[in-house]
Amino acid sequence: SAAALALLLCAGQVIALPVNSPMNKGDTEVMKCIVEVISDTLSKPSPMPVSQECFETLRGDERILSILRHQNLLKELQDLALQGAKERSHQQKKQSSYEDELSEVLEKQNDQAELKEGTEEASSKEAAEKRGDSKEVEKNDEDADGAKPQASLEPPXXXEAEDQTPGEEEAASTHPLASLPSKKRPGAQAEEDHEGPSQGPVDREKGPSAEQGPQAEREEEEEAEAGEKAVPEEEGPRSEAFDSHPSLGYKEMQRGWPQAPAMDGAGKTGAEEAQPPEGKGAREHSRQEEEEETAGAPQGLFRGGKRGEPAQEEEERLSEEWENAKRWSKMDRLAKELTAEKRLQGEEEEEEEEEDPDRSMKLSFRAPAYGFRGPGLQLRRGWRPSSREDSVEAGLPLQVRXYLEEKKEEEGSANRRPEDQELESLSAIEAELEKVAPQLQSLRRG
């Protein structure tokens, strides 16, 4: 048994011993060469050179070559990774620069919008201040108008209306200018009142048996002289008031219309009574409409003395809207009245030419005085240009319409400014985005 155990041990040792084969020899040589290379790299102060045989063995071994190739591949991958990181950082810098540019553009646009809003607010404040000043002037003028004595005009007007003869009525009917209401100053009223009573006794002495033609001509001449005397007094202050504030003069003219029958001369009240039925009905209808509108208007517009506190915002806004609506309605109504009066005047002049040709010649020579006198006389006579049939806005109405058109243009431009700003900002943003879009697409593709 002991011998068997000894044999087994010997057999195991024999089996465990390596067999010298050509492959094992090559591997051992490669290992030795690797050891030499490692020892050479580690012993740099005192290098141990590698033999030429080791170099040849290492270069000829495929395993070493594959390892070296793999190492080169790793280096290449590392280089690619570094390049990608650099490109990414560069792209991020570009994107940040584009974002900064966009933010700067947006900030500039916001600053411009704020500046425009500031200028608009300043302009709106200035306009509001101007409106407040104009309303204060209106209040002062209305207070002064309310203080004027008007009751003294009624007795002479009634006495002269009774003393009028049929000749006077016929003469008054030839003047359609007296049918339109107008507002006069106390100086012209006093002159006409002085002339009215002086004419009364003469008419009573003559009686209805006097001739109607010469009497009518004389009355027309006296009325023309009184108008020429009153015009220089009226043209100075009234033209200044209208030039300084067109809407104020227009309002005063509107306010003076309902009071015209009491303030106009005695001969003119008689002329209104002697008008044909059609013209009189049209005038009464228009006067009733004006009185209804003035009664329905806010009190703060026409009577500044009734306001307990100066300037209420809500009342001012309502009054402005009501004024704008009333102006256009007044212009339309006035145009209709003018056309009706011109028609009546044409018919009456034709009748008078048939009756008295000499008188028609005098009227034709006197007619240009109404056309070239200026806005003062046209307003006092009822605001009616005689030789301009196609323009209702002659004289003062031209200023009124120009003022209204400028006001509407300002309001329209103020409403359009915010919309234009928004459109400009949107177009600028779209242009910037279109510039940036291709660059972003190229970055994404890369």
UniProtKB/Swiss-Prot annotation:
GO cellular component labels: chromaffin granule; extracellular space; neuronal dense core vesicle; secretory granule; transport vesicle
Post-translation changes: O-glycosylated; contains chondroitin sulfate (CS). CS attachment is pH-dependent, being observed at mildly acidic conditions of pH 5 but not at neutral pH, and promotes self-assembly in vitro.
PROSITE patterns the UniProt entry points to: GRANINS_1, GRANINS_2
The entry's keywords: Amidation, Calcium, Cleavage on pair of basic residues, Cytoplasmic vesicle, Disulfide bond, Glycoprotein, Oxidation, Phosphoprotein, Proteoglycan, Secreted, Signal, Sulfation
Residues carrying covalently attached carbohydrate according to the record: S413
Subcellular location as annotated: Cytoplasmic vesicle, Secretory vesicle; Cytoplasmic vesicle, Secretory vesicle, Neuronal dense core vesicle; Secreted
Residues recorded as bearing Phosphoserine in the entry: S97, S209, S286, S319, S360, S387, S391, S413, S427
Modified residues (Glycine amide): G304
Acidic residues compositional bias, start-end: 160-171, 347-357
Transmembrane segments: none
Extent of Basic and acidic residues compositional bias: 105-138, 226-243, 319-346, 403-420
Keyword field contains Cell inner membrane: no
GO biological process: defense response to bacterium; defense response to Gram-negative bacterium; defense response to Gram-positive bacterium; mast cell activation; mast cell chemotaxis; mast cell degranulation; negative regulation of catecholamine secretion; negative regulation of insulin secretion
Region (Disordered), start-end ranges: 85-426
Main localization (coarse): cytoplasm
Intrachain disulfide bonds: C33-C54
Signal peptide range in chain numbering: 1-16
Record text on subunit structure and interactions: Self-interacts; self-assembly is promoted in vitro by chondroitin sulfate attachment which occurs at mildly acidic pH conditions. Interacts with SCG3. Interacts with ITPR1 in the secretory granules.
Other information: Binds calcium with a low-affinity.
Family named by the database record: Belongs to the chromogranin/secretogranin protein family.
Name used for this protein in its record: Chromogranin-A
Gene, per the UniProt record: CHGA
